[in-house]
Structure formats: C-alpha cells, structure tokens
Amino acid sequence: MIVSLIATVLFGYLLGSVSFSYIIAKKIKKIDIRSEGSGNAGATNTLRVLGIGPAICVLLLDVAKGVAPALLAIALTNGDYPLVPALAGLAAILGHNWPIYFGFRGGKGVATSIGVVATLLFLPALCAGIVAILSIVFTKYVSLGSLLFAVLTPIAALIMLPFFHYPLEYIYLAVLLAILSLWRHRTNMGRLIAGTENKLGKKHA
C-alpha cells in the first residue's frame, strides 16, 4: 500500500503539472496563456483567448489528468485502500494548480477536480454537474457553475451515503476540494457579488 501510495501520488502530481492550456497556447499563438485574458491557465481562459476548439481539448485533457491517477490507484490497490486514490487525485489537482514545470503558476483545478470526483463519486458528481451546467447556461457565469459543482458534490455524496456507502476518504476529499475551490475562486466570488464577473462568450475586460 505504501509503495502504491507514493507511486500514484507522485504520478498524479507530475501528470497534473502538465499545463495543457499553456502548451496549446504556446503551440498555436506562441503566447503565455497566463498573461492573456483572465490570466488563468485553464479551459475557460483558453476559450476566451484561443476559441472553442482548443478550449475543448484543454478541458478534456485536464479532466483526464484527474481520472488517470485515481483509476491507477484503484487498480494498484484493488480498491481496498480508498485513501490511495483520494490522495492520488488530490496530487493531480495540486499539480494543476501549482505545476512544477511552469514555475508553480497554474489554473484553478476545476476540470481536474471534475475528473477526480467523477471517478470516485460518480453519481454525486453527476448531480452536481447537472446543476452547474444549468447555472452556466442560464447565467453565463462559468465561475458560478464551478463553485456550485465544488460545493454540491460533497453535499450530494453525504445525502447518498446511506444508500451507496461511499468511502469516507472520498467524502473528505470532496469537502477539501470544495474549500480549495472556494479559495481559488475568491476573486471571482467578489466579482460575482459586485456584478462585474465576466460572462461566457464575452472577452475579458
């Protein structure tokens, strides 16, 4: 278990540190995505700066960064030690947010968090995801949808716990990710309250 834990956490962090938005922006426009638009290295800013095609690629790749370490950890431990996939997934998110290859300046970890919790807590993540998507469709605020997903996933998991008996390690992880997401989106929350947050489809002011 210790070897699997170390291996998957290391794998998760190193994979999470691969900033696909940075790499794709450099490849297409030879720019640092962190110096453009909102300055965030993620799919939403990629959409603003590069368009829908590159943004979809970044979104899918960032989600995959969360799925891969969690699945690998489950496979290596036969699902017997839920702490291992939880920490491997967390490591991937920390890698995305603070990537070792790019000066520890990354994104907010939303897509990678989706990959992790969708792997470990599929139904709660699905329910939270539906609410998040609807909020984005009706309000055009991606940050609001991201926050709703982060907060509602652990709530949904707790509601479903008597029926699905999710490992508590997964619940704790979801709560921790919600707190991390709130902190990473603190400036967005300020703009949402002030009514100055950027809407989907509009260029960053």
Curated annotation (Swiss-Prot):
Topological relation to the membrane, as annotated = Multi-pass membrane protein
UniProt EC number: 2.3.1.275
Q: In which pathway does it act?
A: Lipid metabolism; phospholipid metabolism
BP term (GO), one = phospholipid biosynthetic process
Task: Cite the Pfam families for this sequence.
Answer: G3P_acyltransf (PF02660)
GO terms assigned for molecular function: acyl-phosphate glycerol-3-phosphate acyltransferase activity
* Compartment(s): Cell membrane
The protein's superkingdom reads Bacteria
Keywords of the record, alphabetical order, are: Cell membrane, Lipid biosynthesis, Lipid metabolism, Membrane, Phospholipid biosynthesis, Phospholipid metabolism, Transferase, Transmembrane, Transmembrane helix
Q: Which family does it belong to?
A: Belongs to the PlsY family.
Record text on subunit structure and interactions: Probably interacts with PlsX.
This chain's protein is named Glycerol-3-phosphate acyltransferase
Show the taxonomic lineage. Answer: Bacteria, Bacillati, Bacillota, Bacilli, Bacillales
This chain is encoded by the gene named plsY
